[in-house]
């Protein structure tokens, strides 16, 4: 019991630190007067643990399979050479155009290039994510990506975002330096909630990612639609998001938005080269792990 109390106190202290960080960030004119609240479970219930144990086994097997593909690639890249079967890039592989999974790009890498990477995953928890299996697959993606990164020693943080009466609600599921080894279970608390004020949420997570010393920083947003909150929508919200993407690119944050709903063209317009069209929801976990794998190289 004493040990549990210590762990809970640590989580409370962590949440307070995250809240202070959130309070100190300038979110821009589009979010003037909006408060950002950080939520994090201080303890994990047996219910969440049981839920995780129920859904996780096939997802963890998928993670392990993806990890096994990394090792020969890392060895190959220590020697330099051409990378093939990439999900995005500037150079098309003419021999791969027949492929239907989108891995049709190539890139040439020099030997000994830096491979260090930190990852942040931000998941839209707006009410519309409850339609169909959107939230289920987003949660599965978080489970796969968390295990994938932790097993390979890649620092990862995972947040969900929505809105509440006070403004923006951010849910901390996994932290870079979590001490209680229970973040995998916290992922099961992810659910559809209210609206989405993407810009403020993105800025917080991007700032969080920028505290990492790794040279490459990958921020993945999973969303099913445009921003939708009181006083924050349409062209103003789009301009805010484009500005955030551009600002953090200058700070070595690579932002990708994985679109999983019916609003794909609007998301494409906002994020342009950072847009990922996820046609089949069941492929979302694999696609996101491949994206991380690509930046690990």
Language model regions located:
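Phosphate/oxyanion-binding active-site loops and adjacent basic polyanion-contact surfaces
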Residues: 134-138, 193-202, 237, 284-288
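Negatively charged
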Residues: 1-119, 133
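Von Willebrand factor
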Residues: 109-216, 218-221, 257-266
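C-terminal helix of von Willebrand factor
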Residues: 272-297
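VWA/integrin I-like adhesion module and closely mimicked acidic/polar interface patches used
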Residues: 196, 206, 225-269, 278
């Amino acid at each position: 019991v004493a040990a549990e109390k210590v762990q809970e106190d640590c989580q409370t202290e962590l949440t307070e630190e995250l809240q202070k960080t959130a309070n100190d960030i300038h979110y821009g004119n589009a979010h003037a007067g909006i408060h950002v609240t950080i939520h994090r479970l201080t303890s994990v219930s047996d219910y969440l643990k049981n839920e995780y144990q129920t859904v996780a086994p096939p997802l963890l097997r998928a993670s392990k399979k993806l990890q096994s593909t990394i090792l020969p690639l890392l060895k190959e890249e220590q020697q330099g050479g051409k990378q093939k079967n990439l999900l995005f890039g500037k150079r098309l592989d003419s021999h791969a155009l027949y492929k239907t999974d989108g891995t049709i790009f190539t890139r040439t890498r020099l030997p000994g290039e830096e491979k260090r990477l930190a990852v942040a995953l931000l998941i839209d928890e707006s009410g519309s994510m409850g339609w169909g299996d959107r939230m289920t697959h987003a949660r599965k993606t978080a489970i796969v990506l968390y295990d994938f990164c932790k097993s390979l020693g890649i620092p990862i943080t995972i947040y969900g975002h929505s809105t509440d009466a006070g403004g923006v609600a951010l849910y901390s599921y996994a932290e870079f330096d979590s001490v209680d080894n229970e973040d995998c279970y916290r992922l099961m608390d992810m659910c559809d909630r209210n609206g989405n004020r993407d810009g403020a949420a993105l800025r917080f997570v991007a700032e969080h990612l920028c505290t990492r010393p790794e040279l490459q920083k990958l921020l993945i947003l999973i969303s099913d639609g445009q921003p939708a909150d009181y006083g924050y929508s349409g062209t103003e919200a789009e301009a805010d998001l484009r500005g955030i993407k551009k600002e953090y690119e200058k700070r070595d944050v690579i932002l990708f938005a994985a679109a999983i709903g019916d609003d794909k063209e609007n998301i494409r317009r906002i994020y342009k080269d950072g847009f990922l069209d996820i046609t089949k929801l069941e492929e979302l976990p694999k696609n996101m792990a491949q994206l991380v794998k690509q930046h690990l190289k």
